[in-house]
Amino acid sequence: MSASPQSRPTTIACLLGPTASGKTAAALALAARRPIEIVSIDSALVYRDMDIGTAKPTRDERARVPHHLIDIIDPADAYSAAEFRADALRLIGEIAARGRTPLLAGGTMLYYKALTQGLNDLPTADPAVRAELDADAARDGWPALHARLAQVDPATAARLAPNDSQRIQRALEVFLLSGQPMSVLLAAPRRADDEAAAYRFVPVALEPSDRAVLHARIAQRFDAMLDAGFIDEVERLRRREDLHPDLPSMRCVGYRQAWEFLDGDTDYRTMRDKGIFATRQLCKRQITWLRALPERIVVDCVAPDATARALDTLERVLDDHLPA
């Protein structure tokens, strides 16, 4: 599916939206019409054994249409935006070679931005540096490392909470490996490549005209997860000695709140309320990211015919009936 520098870029439809916006329903509706394969743009779906809390597509749904970048790593491991970009570009080519159509679908805007805008030249993770920072944090606490970060990269430190261990560690790691603040490197021009330039990524954004409707859906979905055994799922993960609350996987919305409940730090009602609140905050951030995409095509995800509208829009994108 790659194009030569002189040819017109190949259009790739990207179905984007916040949690509970109906992405799965729209993608499955398209699969009933066309031979598509779905490439997930979701940083939570990459983890194995995290099915209920991530609202992972069911076995039946995945049997109806091939899904990619789901269940690809263990919860103890990490998966970067750079890895996503490389995997997504590879999959787009492989799907096209099979005579099928790739549909990118999800709500992790960091992944989408890396795919469509390129990458910053940040150093890759270094296990030795991370182990040293972990040891420092165990001795002095993350607020002390946050103070250390403020001395070398005040701009990054200012936007991070003193206990945001994952991001503090990464910012210090970048400085130690590169000698430059992360804020400076992130402000530099992004590195693109010819492979991504062969594609025209068209974002179809599922956005709510009434956010209260989406908030109600989020509460209903979280309650359904609890009824489906979400707490038991987290308990099984907790029993693993290699997992802890500061891992990226266990920081996913819902999992952190369930872990706190199982630790006895909160009661069930508080856990539920905090989980719903955290999901709504994630939704708010996702919508903010979407609205920063001037080229997006908006579909009202709370309209009664939202799935039909999304399907019609996706088909027009794939048929190239939209202006370039």
From Swiss-Prot:
Residues the entry annotates as binding substrate: 19-24
Top-rank taxon: Bacteria
Segments of this protein annotated with the region Interaction with substrate tRNA: 42-45, 166-170, 251-256, 284-291
Keyword Nucleotide-binding carried by entry: yes
Family annotation (SUPFAM superfamilies): P-loop containing nucleoside triphosphate hydrolases
Cofactor: Mg(2+)
One Gene Ontology term from the biological process aspect of the record: tRNA modification
Keywords: ATP-binding, Magnesium, Nucleotide-binding, Transferase, tRNA processing
The EC number(s) this enzyme carries: 2.5.1.75
GO MF: ATP binding; tRNA dimethylallyltransferase activity
Nucleotide-binding as UniProt keyword: yes
Positions bound to ATP: 17-24
Function: Catalyzes the transfer of a dimethylallyl group onto the adenine at position 37 in tRNAs that read codons beginning with uridine, leading to the formation of N6-(dimethylallyl)adenosine (i(6)A).
PANTHER family: TRNA DIMETHYLALLYLTRANSFERASE (PTHR11088:SF60)
Name this polypeptide is given: tRNA dimethylallyltransferase
Lineage: Bacteria, Pseudomonadati, Pseudomonadota, Betaproteobacteria, Burkholderiales
Gene name tied to this protein: miaA
